[in-house]
Regions:
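NAD(P)-dependent short-chain dehydrogenase/reductase
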Residues: 158-211, 216-218
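Active-site segment of SDR-like NAD(P)-dependent oxidoreductases
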Residues: 87-89, 128-136, 174-177
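C-terminal substrate-binding subdomain of Rossmann-fold SDR/epimerase-dehydratase oxidoreductases
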Residues: 199-200, 204-305
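NAD(P)H-binding glycine-rich loop region in Rossmannoid oxidoreductase-like domains
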Residues: 61-103
């Protein structure tokens, strides 16, 4: 099945696609994927919900984003709910844990209400690779509230979906790229780009550490295509496996700079990867041709322009 046909079936098999957190990195990436169809078809099928009412100009088209109180009333029975609304991890540095949890509880309330009240076809939960820290009872529990909350929401969404006959697509995200990147301070990739642009040098503290990178639009498309099947699926994000040294080298190449600008450290950090082969296989089955790391970096550099 071609990607164009697959995208069509994703929309045709669902009454509606709801993107919650539409103005964020993953929300815009999901809209990018769906908008690859004729704009008129996309506008008929998509409901965008954000923290407030506004308009989003994406790829030359204006899209209305509804506030939560208005948006939830427009969710149709049989919709796919793409849940991309969540406070970023680095906000824990600016808020107390209590404030962070309270604000996230306010945000996820709409998602939980949608599952309970709207008879959704499927619900897509964007979790995080850090949730695995809580997978085994014998492990020492970290104090990071972000990790703890991601794991607890996996459990809650699973229970809600099971009780309301809604298929759950749960994806633990490890490392992303893409032109809608909006987190510039705490990601290795964005840090490398900043260093290369400002210092003409990239400091790679853990050159041998491995990560898997996937383009956010490729990830969103794979998730939406799977969600259209109406089946429970849980997996880690995947993409291309690279070391931090290889990533830095590709960033320099993308900026037209020489690899002599690398400053390599000797810190041994654990790899940050999940069962990426499963995701890559699922993406292939869905007809999604994942971008290689060079193309991913080229797309990501657009976020800095």
């Amino acid at each position: 099945m071609t990607l164009e046909k697959l995208q069509g079936s994703t929309l045709d098999q669902s009454e509606q696609v709801v993107i919650y957190g539409a103005n964020g990195w993953m929300g815009r990436s999901a809209l990018d994927f769906i908008s690859a169809l004729k704009p008129t078809i996309a506008k008929e099928k998509i409901l965008l919900i954000g923290s407030k009412s506004c308009f989003l100009n994406l790829n030359g088209s204006n899209h209305e984003i509804f506030a939560p109180s208005t948006g939830i009333t427009s969710i149709r029975e049989g919709a796919i709910f793409f849940n991309a609304a969540f406070l970023r991890r680095e906000l824990l540095q600016k808020m107390t844990p209590e404030e962070y949890l309270h604000k996230n509880n306010e945000i996820v309330a709409l998602a939980k209400s949608a599952i309970k009240e709207k008879k959704l076809l499927s619900f897509i939960n964007l979790s995080s690779g850090v949730a695995r820290d809580f997978d085994h009872e014998f492990q020492i529990k970290p104090t990071d509230e972000y990790s703890r909350l991601k794991k607890s929401l996996e459990i809650e969404y699973s229970e809600y979906c099971s009780q309301n006959q809604t298929a759950l697509v749960n994806c633990r995200i490890f490392s992303l790229t893409g032109r809608h990147l909006n987190e510039f301070d705490n990601l290795a990739l964005s840090s490398f780009v900043y260093q290369a642009k400002s210092k003409n040098q990239i400091d790679v503290k853990s050159p041998s550490t491995k990560r898997t990178y996937v383009d956010a639009t490729d990830l969103a498309g794979t998730l939406l295509s799977i969600a259209a099947l109406g089946k429970d699926v849980s997996f880690d994000s995947g993409g291309e496996l690279v070391t931090m040294r290889q990533l830095a080298e590709r960033v320099l190449a993308g900026l037209g700079k020489d690899v002599s600008a690398l400053a390599l450290g000797d810190i041994e950090s654990p790899d940050y990867i999940g069962e990426f082969e499963k995701f890559n296989s699922l993406a292939s089955e869905m007809g999604q041709n994942l971008l290689g790391i060079e193309d991913q970096i080229t797309n990501t550099l657009n976020a800095f322009n």
